[in-house]
Amino acid sequence: MKADKDTFVLIHGKQGIMSHTATANLPSLLAIAKRYRMERLWINADRAKSLGLKDGDLVEISSPLATKKIHIMVTERIHPEAAFIPGGYGNASPRLKTGYGFGISPNDFTPSRVEPISGQAMMMEVLVKIRKVGD
């Protein structure tokens, strides 16, 4: 997959303090995540600069399945063609009262596809577009 100027390969993973929906609903862990803005979308510094983006900017990320808004973290610690969303955020159930509405979920952008040989979910084969919103 080759990404063009505003297209990225969406990747996701866990963070040291967050692992699943349940941990995002724990007040002490969510307080840490909010304090350090851990829900942000990671984008490579060179790619961000080419799109006129700065650390903390609000962007719109979209795939054929979803469009969401999220603030970005500009970093050298990611491949230029990738955008990273930490997992565990973006809880859609209002019953998860603590974590509800915080961050976005990579699952919202990911179609239900299975790799035919291994039977694993194809969750890292998603292309997304990213553009700045607001000022």
For the regions a protein language model found, what residue spans apply to each?
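Long, low-complexity segments enriched in small/aliphatic residues
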Residues: M1-A31
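Long, contiguous, secondary-structure-rich segments that constitute the structural scaffold
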Residues: T21, L26-W42, D46-D135
